[in-house]
């Protein structure tokens, strides 16, 4: 996160893109976070935009999450310079380079090029939420929402888990 928020000399960010594309089947943590904490994510995006001195922010969400798109679009009306971008569901849409191309139509050249070389700073939904928590609530990053899923679980869930929680404890929580 720190590296992305500190562009190299001579580089200038033009926009921030929040990656709300869950690139693996069955992952739903970002989706739940958007439904339960949309304003915190939007404020987190504003804070990132301020940190890199840009006026434009995007949140890319796959179009198989119409409830999140509708809610985030409605809430974003109160936040200047922020646009919600519905995206086609295709793998690997959540890859940083693919996301930049889909949202702002710019292609990141081959390495050693990085997103800032095309004016983009990319963070994910969880990071925007964590930045909100850190700045607005003075809460350090000690936990995060994660998806625990699989055919052998009785109750697949999104759990708020402390960093370092053993996998077995999370599995036991879901049966």
Residue locations for each model-derived region?
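A generic alpha-helix preference that emphasizes hydrophobic side chains
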Residues: 42, 167-168
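Hydrophobic alpha-helical positions that pack around
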Residues: 55-167, 173-175
């Amino acid at each position: 996160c720190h590296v992305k928020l500190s562009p190299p000399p001579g580089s200038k960010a033009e926009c921030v893109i929040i990656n709300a594309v869950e690139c693996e089947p069955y992952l739903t943590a970002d989706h739940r976070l958007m439904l339960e904490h949309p304003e915190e994510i939007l404020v987190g995006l504003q804070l990132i935009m301020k940190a890199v001195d840009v006026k434009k922010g995007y949140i890319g969400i796959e179009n198989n999450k119409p409830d999140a798109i509708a809610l985030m679009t409605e809430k974003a009306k109160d936040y200047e310079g922020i646009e919600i971008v519905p995206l086609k569901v295709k793998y690997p849409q959540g890859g940083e380079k693919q996301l930049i191309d889909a949202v702002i139509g710019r292609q990141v050249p081959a390495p050693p090029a990085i997103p800032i070389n095309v004016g983009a700073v990319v963070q994910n939904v969880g990071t925007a939420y964590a930045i909100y928590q850190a700045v607005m609530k003075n809460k350090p990053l000690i936990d995060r929402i994660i998806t625990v899923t699989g055919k052998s679980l009785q109750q697949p869930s999104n759990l708020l888990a402390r960093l370092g929680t053993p996998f077995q404890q999370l599995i036991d929580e879901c049966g």
